[in-house]
Amino acid sequence: MKDGSAPFNADVVTYNTLMKVWGRAAQTLAEGRGRGDVNEVIHAMDDVPEELNHGGVYTAKDAADRALTILNTVEKNYLTGASDIAPNTFGYNIVLDGIAKCHAKDAPEQVEKIFNRMKRVSVEGVPHPDEDEEYLNGDVSKWAAVRPDAISYSIVMETIGQSREYGIMSKVENLLEDIEAEYEKTNDPELKPVTRVANSAINAFLKNSGSIKGHKASSNKAWLSAKKVHEIVNTCNRKWKETGDASYQPDITTITMAIDSYSRCNDIAATERGEFLFEKVYKDWKKTGDSKLKPSSRSFTVVSFCDSNYHT
C-alpha cells in the first residue's frame, strides 16, 4: 500500500481479543481500580466496527455486558451467513469469566444460562425460530467448537458459588459429576477434571459455607460443606494414586481450602480435622520437597484461625 497501511480482516482471534479486553475491564472495575485506559484501547482500534465499541462503560457489569454483546454479534452474523467467523469455546469462556468477575447479582444466573446454551447448541445445533426456515450455519456440525471444556465448568462452578439461593450446592455437585462423566465417556483432554477443576468446586462450597456460633442450622451447613470438600479431596487423592497422574494430585490450594472449610464449623472436632490435614501436608512437603505442597502464608493463617476455634 502506498500509505503504508494494510487491509484489516477481522477473524475469530480479533473478536476474542476484543472480548478479553472487556472481560479484563470488568475485573478491573469490580476491583475498584477505575476505568483505566479501556476506552482508549478500544477506540484506538479504528478498524473495529463502530457498533462494537461506542457508548460509555461505568461499571463492571457494563464491561461484562459489552463482551457479551460482541459474542452475540459474532454468533448472530455466523448463523445468518453474514460472516464466516464462527464463535468458539475460548471466546465463550472469556465472556463467562468477565461476567463472573463483575460480581453482579445476576452473574450466576447469566453464566449458567450461557453455559447451558453452549452445551445445547454443541450437540443440537441452532434451530431457526421459524420451523419452516433454517439458519445458513445452524447445523450441529458448525457448533461442535463451542462445547464447554474444563475451564468452562470451573468458571461456572465458582460463579454459582456467589449465589445465595437455596439448592446452589447441588448444582455444583451436578456439574462436577457431569464433567467427570463426560471425560470418562470421551477421554477428551479438554474435559479432564484435573485439580484445578476440583479446586473450583471446593471454592464454590467455601463461598456458601460459614457458621455462626450457637446457630445450629448454620453449623450444620458448614459441616455439610466441609464433608463434601473432604470428599472431593479424597477423590483427587484416589485418582492420583490409581493413575499416577500428577494432574489429579491435590495441591496446597486444595488442602488449604479443605482446612478453611473445617475452620468455619466452629467445632472442636472440625478443628482437629483441619489440624490433621495441615500436619499431613506439611510432613509430605518436608518429605518430598514437592513445591505444590509447600504451605503458603494463607495455609498458616487458616490453620491458626482453625486452632483459635479450639480455644474459644
Where are these regions (language model features)?
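Short coil/turn connectors between adjacent alpha-helices in alpha-solenoid helical repeat scaffolds
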Residues: 23-66, 99-111, 159-171, 206-228, ...
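Fungal C-terminal region signature
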Residues: 221, 263, 273, 290, ...
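Pentatricopeptide repeat
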Residues: 11-16, 20, 88-93, 97, ...
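Intrinsically disordered terminal tails
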Residues: 253, 279, 298-305, 309-312
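Low-complexity/repetitive intrinsically disordered segments
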Residues: 1-12, 311-312
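Hydrophobic packing position at a conserved site in alpha-helical tandem repeat units
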Residues: 1-4, 22, 45-48, 52, ...
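Helix-start/N-cap signature of alpha-helical segments
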Residues: 7, 11, 60-63, 84, ...
